Amino acid sequence: MLKKLFFYVLLLCSITAFSQVKVEGTVIDEITKKPLQGVKVRVNSPRRYAETDSKGRYVLQLPQGDFLLFFSLNGYTTREEVVMIEKERRQLLDPYALSPDYAQEAEQLAVISENELEDDESQADAMSGLLQSSQDVFMRRAAFDFSSVFFKPRGYDSKDVSVLINGIPMNRLENGRAQWANWGGLNDITRNQELSNGIAKSDYTFGGLAGSTYIHIRPSLNRPGLRFSSSLSNRSYVGRLMATYSSGLQRNGLAYTLSASRRWAANGSWVDGTLYNAYAFSGAIEYQLNNYHNFNLVGLFSPIKRGKTSPLTREAIDLMGYRYNPYWGDQQGDKRNSRNRIISEPIFVLSYNYQKDDTRLNVDLGYQFGEIGNTRISYGNAQNPEPNYYKKMPSYYLNQQPSDEAMAELQKNYFLNNSQLNWADLYAANRNATDGRSAFIVSNDVNRERTFTTNVNFSTPVYENIKSTSGLVYRRITSDNYALVDDLLGGNYFMNYDYFESQPYNSLEADRKKQQGDKWNYSYALNSNVVEAFSQLEFTFKKAEVFVAARYHYTDVQREGNFYYPVYPDSYGKGALQVQKGMSTKAGFTYALTGRHLLQFNTAYFNTPQSVRNIFVNVRNSNRLLPNIKNEVAYTADANYILRLPYLKSRLTGYITEIENTSETNFFYTETALTDEISNGFVAQTIDGIKKRHFGLEWGAEAQLLPTLKLSAAVALGQYTYVNNPKLYISSDDIPQGIAYDEVKLKNYHVPSGPQQAYSVGLEYRSNNYWWVSATANLLAKNYVSLSALNRTSQFFIDPNTRQSFTNIDYDKARQLLKQERLDDVFLVNLVGGKSWRVKKVYISAMLSINNLFDTQFLSGGFEQSRTANYGKMLQDNAHGVPSFGNRYFVGYGRTYMANLAISL
């Protein structure tokens, strides 16, 4: 019986295989008429996929009948074609031409210019860089139109997206996020990107909760020729020059690409004092040994230095306006910023690729080294020199007991005339010191990291309708972390000494006098090994597709202190090896009702190790680990309806996600009662065991009203809330061992993940004479500030002076003080337009984008301060409506523009 069953199954498979027709075709560039490599060719019913090779060729196996073929490639307009498959065993289709999508290219350029460096910890880590290449209408709106208000799809963090360059993971050990600035200014060479949205499948990685971005850097994929471009802007930088040459695939099997760019803003752009000084260089060479074997070497280097902007209190905004930046001051006619971010981390990737039919093998070796620095003014035994320090603001005198309104008015006038950092005073103070000791210096917090990565990825069909993909990644990461004396500001030396605790920062050294370039304050190393293995199976049926995938993740981390800081007895030497392991799974099902109507369902379980910053009590000064470290766990599911009509494309998605065991670490000074004996101090705070729920809807649609007119719309309706009361763990110089402090009452508060609602409608006109213009109107709402955990513990109602509960508590007033602030809704109008010409063999394109056309002033995010984290102090601080320690806000850009001219030879 079993033999007969096996025979009939084999016969059925043979009949099915026999009835298939081998369909071959080519895809070319509509303008250059040259073949396009990497074009995705897809049939929805039955489910079939192919990708064009270096000669633009593709092959599909299809039965007889009429089918709808979809052609898509990043940077080109997605097209579709109805084909009729005859009875022949082999059928050749006419060449199919794709036209460049200049609107998408312009949007990508504008997005990159505005956001490629907005990755500071204090900001919302806009995910636009992760979304810019998407063909999806909703994702493109999220990247271009919503990103200026720090919108995040589904409220996910950028650490939830896996970013890879030629198979090498780019997410960092410290915080789990990719550093997009490492390839900033190299748009031409990194534009070939493949995205998996959310928990959908990927051919190269298991992916994160928010998906994956795979950047393909292969010279054979780039358009051959020489391309020059120049940009003017008033956003992050004022000018940019770029040149890229791609040889294309030559007869000897070689292809290479060279690219370089320069971006600059001497004294800032939209915000004064935000220096921007960046270069970028890249080289890639590819050798195709034959039709199956390929070698590829890539080098990327994008050094940059840029000035930061400060989050502002409402008082500072009211006095100085939305473009105020206290970090800079005049120094001999230049606007010098005290807080700069300096990045210099080259990347090298060597790859071997094998492909024969549907079998693919990728072996990649990656090495990245260099450093990231963040400068700041440090001072020993002196007062904070920042012009907006709370004691220099009018509110300081208003909020005293008794209030001094006359002094507040005098201080207001003084502040208005002295609102910027006074470099001359700092130099004078240091030079006038009797022994030459600097009271003020510019310090640089340095992270010097070296990462070696090996990646192996293998994909092959195991049966006619079953495809297997597996991958293995090993990373060895070594990082040195320390503070560096960057500038003595006219003095002769700086003491490596903690005047607050009356202790040296390193008692192992005899000479505590530090010169420029010396380490001070803290110094430690982190050594880590990361192993990640994943496997994925895809099952393709006539009208359906199913995938299942699993990932195993191993991470170990060990801290080694180089300084002995007496306040922390375990600051020096090697600490314990912390090992974290986790297994994650996901699955998806896609069903084609017809070739134009699809239903898709995905579900996943993630078990992910905590980032390094969330496992130590105080990583700068101590080897001590937090107790009961648990992996972050997430459960998620989504359902999608996808519509692809000739004149209407749409996606509707519903999703729900629960995230558990999340941790958040912050450092600040507080006047809250920490213990029975300690009423204030500089605190390292970790909120542990946070549980969040994210659910909502996403909808994006695009309608071709006329051959030249397109209407688009996008809607995001989300709700992101805390669903438990996690634990608070704190340590300070007075509590170096750390203590489990209290429960934080966060339940039902909103997670501060950017706007939770977004609406967009747009029109695009595309002339047959190769010019186009588009406009979008966007509304972003339900954006909440980050919460102070200390404000929401039982200690909030404890008087730090008496250690007893405050008397005469007005609980209605307390609820008002603790109400989470919802920022004002934001309405923005954006315009993008362009024109292209072809003069003989020269192609010219011009683009202009204007964001926030009506110059709307808005706040893009904010956070509560924890300085006055008790009822009495907060009540006093808010008594006159101008709190000294009120919420701090990140200010959005006003009207900005970018103009770009590109010439391709």
Predicted features by range, described:
Residues 130, 139, 168-199, 215-218, ...:
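Short acidic/polar hinge/loop motifs at secondary-structure boundaries
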Residues 286, 294-351, 375-443, 501-514, ...:
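Acidic/polar loop-and-plug regions of large Gram-negative outer-membrane beta-barrel proteins
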Residues 659, 711, 779-801, 809, ...:
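C-terminal beta-signal and adjacent terminal beta-strands/loops
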Residues 656-658, 681-790, 900-904:
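Gram-negative outer-membrane beta-barrel transporters
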Residues 323-347, 351, 514-518, 522-528, ...:
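Outer-membrane beta-barrel signature, preferentially recognizing the C-terminal barrel domain
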Residues 305, 311-316, 513, 556-567, ...:
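Surface-exposed extracellular loop regions of Gram-negative outer-membrane beta-barrel proteins
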Residues 441, 467-594, 727:
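Signature of Gram-negative outer-membrane beta-barrel scaffolds
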Residues 202, 212-249, 260-272, 776:
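Short strand-turn segments of transmembrane beta-barrel domains in outer membranes
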